[in-house]
Design a protein with these regions (language model features):
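Short hydrophobic alpha-helices and adjacent helix-cap/hinge residues
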Residues: 2-195
Length: 195
């Protein structure tokens, strides 16, 4: 449980704070120093409700922050003809990116392609079973509201970072601004975003 919280906190700090910290001399207050997970690489998976421009951009910026802080070796992130395509980006991360600390797991990518009737329940079932019994993922990036809703539960204890969710509290992803309700789930919450 503690490792899950550490993994989620680490990725959230890197993705949200690194751009701010990289231009400041106060990095000592926000340590994002790369480290292994008990001598092993952190294993990361990804899920989304379906292709969406913001999801790819959020993933690209997260990877840039990971590069800026040394978690992933600096490289040119491939462009895509489809600005909402995270699959090709994930394949590149899994196959071609280099890191001594992270492994983007090739077969730990799920997109429901906005199919709420068939693909979403199927993906949720497969993901939750793997997270509970697979012991091969340390952290999930849940991009968007559907992904956050599907992974924010007590059925598993793998760290989850929810990004690009419209309203995590109203959507039932987290319980409040101050507490997600789960030790292994982190989501960015801005209560004034839609005021």
């Amino acid at each position: 449980m503690r490792k899950a919280a550490q993994a989620a906190t680490c990725l959230l700090l890197v993705s949200l704070l690194a751009p701010l910290c990289s231009f400041s001399e106060d990095r000592r207050f926000y340590p994002v120093t790369p480290r292994l997970n008990d001598g092993q690489k952190w294993r990361i998976g990804y899920c989304e409700g379906g292709p969406y421009l913001d999801y790819r951009q959020n993933l690209v910026e997260t990877v840039r922050a990971l590069m800026a802080t040394g978690w992933v070796e600096t490289a040119d992130i491939p462009r895509s003809d489809d600005d909402s395509d995270t699959r090709r980006l994930w394949d590149w991360l899994a196959e071609d990116s280099r890191s001594r600390f992270l492994r983007f797991v090739a077969d730990a990518y799920w997109s429901s392609d906005w199919d709420e009737q068939t693909a979403r329940p199927h993906n949720k079932s497969v993901m939750l079973k793997r997270l509970k019994t697979g012991n091969d993922l340390d952290l999930m990036i849940a991009m968007g509201t559907w992904a956050g809703q599907d992974l924010a539960n007590s059925y598993h204890q793998v760290a989850v970072v929810v990004a690009a969710a419209t309203n995590p509290i109203q959507a039932g992803i987290v319980k409040s601004v101050d507490d997600s309700g789960y030790d292994h789930v982190l989501a960015k919450v801005d209560p004034a975003r839609y005021l």
